[in-house]
Amino acid sequence: YIADMHFGHENVIRFDDRPFADTEQMDEALIQNWNERVTADDSVYVLGDAFWKNEENSIRIMQRLQGHKHLIQGNHDRVKGKLRPYWESIEQYAEVNDENRLVILSHYPILFYKNQHYGAVMLYGHVHNTREWELVEKWKKEQWAMGIPSRLINVGCMMAYMNYTPRTLDELLEANPQPMIKRIRKDGTNAGENSNGEL
């Protein structure tokens, strides 16, 4: 899983403070990282904003990327024309079974998602590592504090745990551990405490 690679997008280097001198260096690093992790038999879900405008350059890059490539369309993705056949699927939203775990895929964060209370994971992009991402994280913490599981994970390539590389679900969950749920009783005490107020 990965999002927001923005191949060929000069401005995103400054926007994300990416460690690349130019788009050529960024594109080559993204391709190398991808191919070091992805085999010809692997499936990779790109959660939007894969490329920036130049169709011919995008095709050249797609030809170099290993694996079965699936696009969850983002606001910058163009899915018509010559690039379309290089994607095995193109969806606005998807639900996949990853080793018997339900994973919800969208370019945009969905705060209330299917089977949230039953362990489903929601992967998203779009917000990069901006104030919007911080707001999603704040909301997640508030949900966990109320005993509501909220496993939203930003798979934008610029996130430290992504390091411009596609990641497995296990890697994402390890890098984004769930906090301990503290259920609050109607009387205001923590359900994890004993009568002495100790955990």
Feature locations, PLM:
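Active-site neighborhood of phospho(di)ester-bond hydrolases with catalytic His/Asp-centered motifs
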Residues: 2-3, 44-49, 69-75, 105-106, ...
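N-terminal active-site segment of His-dependent metallophosphoesterases
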Residues: 1-58, 149-151, 155-160, 192, ...
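Short, conserved, surface-exposed binding loops centered on an aromatic residue
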Residues: 34-36, 60-64, 95-97
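Short, glycine/acidic-enriched loop or turn micro-motifs at the edges of active sites
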Residues: 7, 52, 77, 110, ...
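A short, conserved beta-to-alpha structural element at the edge of catalytic cores
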Residues: 22-37, 67-84, 151-177
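Metal-dependent catalytic neighborhoods of phosphoester/phosphodiester hydrolases
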Residues: 47-65, 73, 78-92, 114-117, ...
